[in-house]
Amino acid sequence: LPLDNLEGWNDKIFDGSVWPAAGEEWALEVPLGLCDDPVSQSQMPLKISFSENGHHAFCGMIVSGKSTLLQTLFYALIHKYSPEYVNLYGIDFSSHMLSAFEAAPHVGGVIYEDNTEKMEKFFHMMEELMEERKRLFQGGNYSQYVRANGVKVPAVIIAIDNYANFREKTDNKYEDVMMHLAHDGVGYGIFLAVTAGGFGTTEIQTKIGDNIKTVITLQMNDKF
C-alpha cells in the first residue's frame, strides 16, 4: 500500500518548500503501511516510533521485503521531518536500495560493503558523537535535552540492511561500537534500524538484540 493512500499522510509531509512544524512534544514516528491482525482477519496501519520504542529490527526470510521496508522508512522520515530534526545514515550490505536516498539533505551517507575506509570513518564519527552528546546532555538524555532546549541537535538513525552480511564481511570489527550504540545510543538520540533473518549466532547476536525493544516481523522461515 503506498503511503499516499494512508489516511492523513498527505496532510503532514513536506509540501515542496517547507516541512510541517514539529509538535509540542518531541516525537520521531512514521507510518510504514499496513500490518495483519490474524485474530480479527483484518489489517491496520503500522506506525513505528523511535521516540517511544528506541531501536528497531525488521526480521524476515530472503525476499520478504526487508530492504523495501527500509526504503519506506527513509522515504517517510525524509518527507515528514526536516534535516535539522533527523539525520539518516545507511549501511547497505544487501541490494543497494538505500542508494536512492544518497542525495537527500537528511542523509549523511550510504556505505556499501566495499567502502572499508568510509566505514571506519563513520563508526569513529559515531563514537565521537556519543562522547560529544554525553558532555552536552550533562547526565540527562536526548528527550530531556529536547524538552528543555528544543531540537538543537538532530536525532540520528543508523539503518543497517542485512545485519548478518555486515557482521560477516567486516569480521565483527565494529561489534564493540555496535554494542555501545545499542546500549547507550537511544539516550543520545541515536537509533538503530537493522534488517536480519532473525536473532541468533549468525544474525543479531544476544548482546545487541537485548537492547532492541521493537521487532517488526515479515515472512519468516520459522519462529525466532
For each feature predicted by the language model, list its residue ranges.
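Interdomain helical linkers/hinges and coiled-coil/dimerization scaffolds
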Residues: L6-W9
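P-loop NTPase catalytic phosphate-binding loop
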Residues: D11, G16-S143, R147-K223
